Amino acid sequence: MLYEAVQGLNITPVGIYVDVTFGGGGHSKEIINHLSADGRLFAFDQDQEAFENQLEDHRFHLIEGNFSDIKRHLKFHGITAVDGILADFGVSSSQFDSGKRGFSTRFDGPLDMRMSHSGQLDASQVINEYPFEAVSYTHLRAHE
């Protein structure tokens, strides 16, 4: 799916693109391969572990934060329009491959489930401290 997703962007070599879910960097690496020296790629991730995958390339800018702030961050960089946006929503496979984040069903670990460690509320607090009705309502809303 990586190549198909990037192909769907119909990349212009001098274009400006955004990967709003950087994660392991696979999509961003493929986008960079299609850009000329004048093309630019901005990527977002709120998971600090994603920064271990940062690309060392003058055309690439990794922004720590949620893509909901895309307009503000791009404006800061002088960008008012982009040629394409890629979003691969969901949990990163690296978050499933370890028990330490609380997403894995294969490994024991804390019930955390935060996309960013900077978030103050983790899943354990919700399960153990919220009233049953609130947790039930949250679960039902997620499955509508």
Task: Indicate residue ranges for each PLM-predicted region.
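Conserved alpha-helix/loop element of class I SAM-dependent methyltransferases that forms part
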Residues: 1-13
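Residue-level signature of catalytic and energy-coupling elements of molecular machines
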Residues: 5, 21, 88
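A general structural motif
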Residues: 12-14, 38, 80-82
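SAM cofactor-binding core of SAM-dependent methyltransferases
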Residues: 16-72
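Short amphipathic alpha-helical segments
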Residues: 55-56, 75, 97-100
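A short acidic, Gly/Pro-enriched loop at the edge of an enzyme's catalytic core
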Residues: 74-84
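A mobile, often basic/glycine-rich helix-loop segment
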Residues: 83-87, 91-128, 132
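Conserved small/polar residues in nucleotide/adenosyl-binding loops
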Residues: 138-144
